[in-house]
Design a protein with these regions (language model features):
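Active-site catalytic motif of lipid deacylating hydrolases and related acyltransferases
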Residues: 40-120, 224
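Serine-dependent carboxylesterase/thioesterase catalytic core
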Residues: 82-83, 100-191
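N-terminal secretory signal peptides that target proteins for export/translocation
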Residues: 1-9
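Solvent-exposed, acidic/flexible segments
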Residues: 60-68, 89, 93, 126-134, ...
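C-terminal catalytic-base region of ester-bond hydrolases, centering on the histidine
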Residues: 168-272
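Bacterial N-terminal signal peptides
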Residues: 15-24
Length: 272
């Protein structure tokens, strides 16, 4: 019933959504992102972590004004040992799969064996359509028995896709969202398909009814249809939260994860 209501509510906006996406296309190249744009050498070493960030809308993978790209560049500038980070266009999920498989295929035989799958260290995050792409790629990886350490969805918009259901290959998942937009709002809650295997570490709501966000760097076409959705992409607090989640996962526990009052207690951690 919940999914039916969700689909019915959103289906009426399809024409407007098409316009929204068209407006965001801007000067994006026709071909878009290609594999040679990645800088990560493959395969990566067994103890190394691969982080993938998916941009929203029709933005290019290297659009420096978007929060996903800005955070990726910030983490990359930290020169963290054993960490590789890339950003992707949300529609380039096949490209993401190719990079993931090449990264963890240590013997480069075109197949991830049990040892290679077990040692894979993958983190994914994404905003808007990029948040939904994170779940879609996670499901594809689940079909191959490839684990994901952490997924973070930021105002995830899947339209007809069930991006609120997290597959069991994901160990930990977090969701940041707003409900103030008239057209584009994120998933208000994500759920583990198997709570015994996936821990939902946060469902965090951001309120933009009165919160002031500097939108001077946001093009008018992105503000036209959903100001709160665009505000979330430009909100430093949002990306500080995502950064802490990611750095905590790769071992920088000094930063913590989230303010205690914002964490949803999902029960025992599958890590034991």
């Amino acid at each position: 019933m919940r999914d039916k209501k969700r689909l019915t509510a959103r289906s009426g906006f399809l024409a407007t959504i098409v316009l929204f996406i068209a407006l965001q296309t801007g000067c994006a190249s026709i071909r878009g992102q290609q594999y040679h744009h990645f800088s990560t050498p493959t395969p990566i070493e067994e103890n190394q972590t691969l982080i993938l960030g998916f941009l929203g809308g029709r933005e290019n993978w290297n659009e420096s004004s978007r929060g996903v790209r800005q955070l990726a560049m910030k983490i990359d500038s930290m020169n963290l040992p054993d960490v590789h980070i890339e950003t992707l266009e949300n529609r380039k999920r096949d490209l993401a799969m190719e990079l993931i498989l090449n990264s963890f295929d240590s013997n480069q035989d075109g197949y991830l064996d049990e040892r290679e799958r077990g040692s894979a260290r993958l983190i994914m995050f994404g905003h808007s359509l990029g948040g939904a792409a994170v779940v879609k790629v996670s499901n594809n990886l689940n079909n191959l028995n490839i684990p994901v350490l952490l997924t973070v969805q930021i105002d995830s918009v899947g339209f007809t896709y069930d991006d609120h259901v997290i597959p069991p290959n994901v160990k930990r998942a977090a969701n940041l969202f707003q409900l103030d937009g008239w057209l584009l709002v994120g998933e208000d809650e994500i759920f583990a398909q198997d709570p015994n295997k996936t821990r939902i570490i946060a469902n965090v709501k951001f309120d933009y009814t009165e919160k002031e966000i500097d939108m001077s760097g946001v093009p008018w076409k992105r503000r036209l249809l959903s100001v709160p959705h665009s505000k979330m992409d430009a909100d430093p607090e949002v990306w500080s939260t995502v950064e802490k989640l990611i750095l905590s996962e790769i071992g920088d526990t000094k930063l913590g994860i989230l303010a205690e009052e914002r964490v949803v207690d999902p029960g025992p951690d599958p890590r034991g």
